[in-house]
Design a protein with these regions (language model features):
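Catalytic-core regions built around general acid/base machinery
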Residues: 97-109
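Asp-based, Mg2+/Mn2+-dependent phosphohydrolase catalytic module
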Residues: 1-10, 106, 120, 124-219
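Active-site neighborhood of HAD-like aspartate-dependent phosphohydrolases
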Residues: 2-49
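An amphipathic alpha-helix signature
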Residues: 27, 31, 44, 48, ...
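Helix-loop "lid/cap" segments that line or gate small-molecule binding pockets
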Residues: 33-34, 54-69, 126, 158-159
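Helix N-cap/coil-helix junction residues
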Residues: 39, 65-68, 132, 164
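Metal-dependent phosphoesterase signature
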Residues: 61-100
Length: 219
């Protein structure tokens, strides 16, 4: 890997928009939640633009879009969590070459972490559904630690636990939260172009590399 001399000492992966396309299931649950408080359905494309900063923020954005009182946030958020848990992997898919990359890192002895802003209750079921759980020594949700991305805390939690120098560590993600967390932690960063980037030109986030396919990291 050209970003490092040899293999990195640690690789941290984002989940939604990086390893999996989860929007079909997220948007379905969000629409159920919105309807439960008398709001209109948002639909998949709108939900795609809101994903990435955790479920509470997602619900807040949806309520604001629909013109519904923020006073309904607690009940709407609870309805979303319930609906999403019931169909967390129903229509979610892996992006191409995810398993090939994970296998390559594992074969070469690279520790891996899964760091997402998604509530931790959803992380294990999704990883187990796709048979990916055993690849990750850390599985951190947005509520696992006191801070979540774009804070560097989750990244440094992992690197410090194995005494890995930050400059020898890599964050792979798709969004501004991933880029900012990596920069604050002094990790190298790779952003994927196919994820949930909220219309931001990824090069403006100053990642080390932007790729269109995870297979590019195997070249």
């Amino acid at each position: 890997m050209s970003l490092f001399e040899g293999w990195p000492d640690l690789v941290c992966f984002d989940l939604d928009g990086t390893l999996i396309d989860s929007v079909p299931d997220i948007s379905k649950a969000l629409d159920i939640a919105l309807q439960s408080v008398g709001a209109a359905k948002a639909g998949e494309e709108r939900a795609r633009a809101w994903v990435g900063f955790g479920s509470s923020k997602l619900v807040s954005q949806a309520l604001e879009w629909s013109g519904t009182s923020i006073d309904t946030h607690e009940s709407c958020h609870s309805a979303f969590l319930k609906a999403y848990f019931e169909s967390v992997s129903e229509n979610t898919t892996l992006y191409p070459n995810v398993e090939a990359l994970l296998k390559a890192f594992k074969y070469n002895g690279v520790p891996m972490a899964l760091i997402t802003n998604k509530p931790s209750v959803f992380v294990k079921p999704i990883l187990e559904h796709f048979g990916l759980s055993d690849y990750f020594s850390w599985q951190l949700g947005g509520d696992t630690l006191e801070e979540k991305k774009p804070s560097p805390v989750p990244l440094l939690h992992c690197s410090e636990s194995i005494e890995a120098a930050p400059e020898r560590c890599l964050m792979i993600g798709d969004s501004v939260a991933d880029a900012r967390a990596a920069q604050a932690a002094n990790f190298k960063s790779v952003l994927v172009s196919y994820g949930y980037n909220h219309g931001i030109e990824l090069s403006t986030l100053n990642p080390d590399v932007v790729i269109d396919d995870l297979a590019e990291l195997l070249m």
